[in-house]
Amino acid sequence: MGARWWLCCFPKETSAHRPHSSPSSDPLPHPTSSAPPAGPPFVSIPSAAAGSTKEMGAKLPYAHVDARLRALAGQAEGFGRHAIGGLHGPVYHVTSLADDGPGSLREACRIREPLWIIFEISGTIHLSSYLRVSSYKTIDGRGQRIKLIGKGLQLKECEHIIICNLEFEGGRGHDVDGIQIKPKSRHIWIDRCSLRDYDDGLIDITRESTDITVSRCYFSMHDKTMLIGADSSHITDRCIRVTIHHCFFDGTRQRHPRLRFGRVHLYNNYTRNWGIYAVCASVEAQILSQCNIYEAGQKKVVFKYMPEKAADREEATSGWIRKCFQCLGTLPNMDYGASICGSQRGSPVMHRMASITKTSRLVVPPKSLCVAAVIGYK
C-alpha cells in the first residue's frame, strides 16, 4: 500500500513567479486526470461506470474542494470545520527550500497577516528549530512534494490554520513533535499529511488547544503517535475537542490517540499492528469511536483505560470510550456546539463533563460512511 494514497498532486501552476498574488480565486487544474487511487479499503468511494471519467472525478474525496485553490477553506468535517486559514489574504509563493530567508516557508509563516502559502518547487526543507506558524495561514502543499525534516511546525497561541499535503520525517531533539499545537490554539485543520519518525510525538494537542480536525493523514514508524491533553494537572484541557477521521495508523506503537480530559470523535480510521494499544482513555477522557478498523498484530489490546487523578479531584478516573462498529446512516449524537476555553470562559475552568449522547446530531456525508470492525483483538 503506497504511503501517499491520500495526497492530491496537481501540475504546477503556470503563472509567473511573484512573492504575493491577489486574493482572487487562483485556479488549479481539475483533479480528475491526476486524482490519487482510492486508497485502503476503509475509504468508501462509489464506483463509476467504465469510461465515466467525469463521474468518477466528482465522487473522489475533495473533488469539489481541489478544483480551485481557496475552495479548501472551511471544508473540514468535525470540530475543526470553522478553520479558514489564509482565505482572506494574498497568495505567498515559496520559492526557496532554505530554512529561512527570502522566499522561504519560515518567512511566510512569521508574517502577521493572513496568507495562503503555496510552493513553486518540490523538495526537502531542513528545519534547524521549530517553525512557528502565526494565525490565519494556509500551508498548501498540493501540486508539489514538500518534506520537513529536523524539527516540526509549532502552532502556539494561534487560530485558523490549515496544513495540507506536507510530509514530516526525522524530527530530532527533546520535545520535538511533527506538529505541536499548544497553548490556546484553535480552529485548526491538518489534512492529507504524512508523519513519521520523530523523537516525541507526531501530532500533540495540549494546553487548551481546541476545535481541531485531523483528516486523511498517514502515520508510520513511530512510538508515541498522538497525545491529546498534557497531563493530569492541566485541568483546563477539559475544553479540548478534536475530530480524527479517515487516517491510517500503520504499525505505530501507541496513542492513536491517547486522550486526557477532552472530547475526541474518531471515525473511518484504519489502525493496524500497533505495539502496545490502539486508543487510550486517561483522566476524564470522552472518546466516540465509530466506523473504525482496528487490525491487531501481536499486541491485542485495542482500547486501554489508564486511571489518573485530576488536580482538582479526590479520586482517579480513566474516562470512557463509546464504540460503534456499524453505523450506516446518521451517527449517534456528538456535541459539535460552541467550545469555551481558559480565559475566554473565566478562571478557574470548572465545567462538568458534557454528554456525547444527549446533544446535537452530526450527519457525516455519504462518502465518509463504511462498516468497520475490530480484527484479532481482546
PLM feature spans:
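Extracellular beta-strand-rich solenoid/capping regions of secreted or surface-exposed proteins
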Residues: R106-E113, T124-T138, K147-C164, G170-K184
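Right-handed parallel beta-helix
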Residues: Y136, G141-R142, E159-G170, S185-D200, ...
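Acidic glycine-/aspartate-rich tracts in secreted/extracellular proteins
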Residues: A98, S122-T124, Q144-R145
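Extracellular beta-rich repeat passengers
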Residues: P27-Y62, R258-K378
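PEST-like, low-complexity acidic/proline-rich intrinsically disordered segments
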Residues: M1-R18
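Acidic Gly/Asp/Thr-rich repetitive segments characteristic of extracellular carbohydrate-active
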Residues: A71-I117
